């Protein structure tokens, strides 16, 4: 078990109620964990974690991942917007990826195996080896959480930057940064980290419940030992996916070219060792992370 990424904190100054977030990975089976610990004002770290993402991702975490309550998004490059991951068989690049077998062969569109592989990526264990029709890679017996190696978690609480309300830029009535800070004050804290299970994960900072999984569409690849299909390869060695540390800032931007500019908290994610891609998510309000197509299009800004 190892840890390569640095720790993160829920506040810029150590105070009562502060949390420390640590990541781990196990190179024996490439499982991972994100843990939250209470942090005392004197800097003492609790010996027992408040929560563990690995435990949240236990066997009974998912019912039927393709239809249940897990919120997962991806990017449809052709449409130019975010979509629900469970609907990604309708995206050209991802479907081609799901159809690739370890030997490099591909199957016809809309095959049962592509559907099964998507369900596997979303957490289903029904097709894991040895007792399955497809013998996909068996993940850690206790959890499907993948390794987090270089991605340092980032905590997002209340907006706390100091953008001025005055200046040369006309924000318009009700669009001042001070208005945004007031409106977003008290929003639920969330912690974000990239995983080599293919997704950037968002967790409720207090409970560890997963709020969102984002599978970047640009990571789709039909090459061997690459792409999302490789995660299900029974001979999987290791591959990096969302390996970069997410960064977050408040920006006065449009959600789309046709939309209106507004203050938003924007997360920029990257692949690091996993590739050369970037993506942006609107993380202003975690309560917007819902399993609807409209929310997927709203939250995912671009890749």
Where are these regions (language model features)?
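A fold-level detector for beta-propeller and closely related beta-sheet-rich head/sensor domains
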Residues: 1-303
């Amino acid at each position: 078990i190892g840890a390569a990424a640095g720790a993160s904190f829920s506040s810029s100054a150590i105070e009562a109620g502060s949390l420390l977030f640590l990541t781990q990975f196990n190179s024996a089976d490439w499982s991972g964990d994100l843990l939250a610990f209470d942090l005392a004002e004197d800097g003492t770290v609790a010996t027992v974690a408040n929560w563990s993402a690995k435990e949240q991702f236990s066997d009974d975490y998912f019912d039927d991942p393709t239809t249940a309550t897990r919120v997962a998004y991806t990017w449809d490059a052709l449409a130019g917007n975010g979509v629900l991951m469970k609907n990604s068989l309708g995206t050209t690049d991802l479907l081609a990826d799901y159809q690739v077998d370890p030997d490099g062969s591909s199957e016809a569109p809309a095959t049962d195996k592509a559907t099964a592989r998507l369900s596997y990526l979303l957490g289903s264990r029904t097709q894991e080896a040895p007792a399955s029709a497809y013998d996909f890679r068996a993940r850690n017996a206790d959890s499907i959480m993948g390794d987090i190696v270089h991605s340092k978690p980032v905590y997002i609480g209340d907006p706390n930057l100091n953008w001025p309300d005055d200046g040369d830029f006309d924000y318009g009535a009700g669009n001042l940064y001070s208005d945004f800070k007031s409106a977003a004050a008290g929003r639920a804290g969330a912690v974000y980290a990239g995983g080599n299970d293919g997704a950037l994960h968002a967790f409720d900072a207090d409970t560890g419940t997963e709020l969102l999984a984002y599978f970047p569409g640009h990571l789709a690849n039909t090459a061997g030992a690459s792409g999302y299909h490789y995660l299900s390869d029974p001979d999987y060695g290791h591959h990096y996916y969302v390996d970069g540390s997410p960064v977050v800032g408040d920006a006065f931007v449009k959600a789309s070219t046709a939309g209106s500019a507004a203050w938003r908290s924007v997360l920029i994610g990257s692949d690091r060792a996993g590739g050369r891609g970037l993506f942006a998510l609107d993380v202003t309000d975690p309560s917007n992370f819902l399993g609807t197509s409209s929310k997927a299009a709203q939250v995912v800004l671009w890749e």
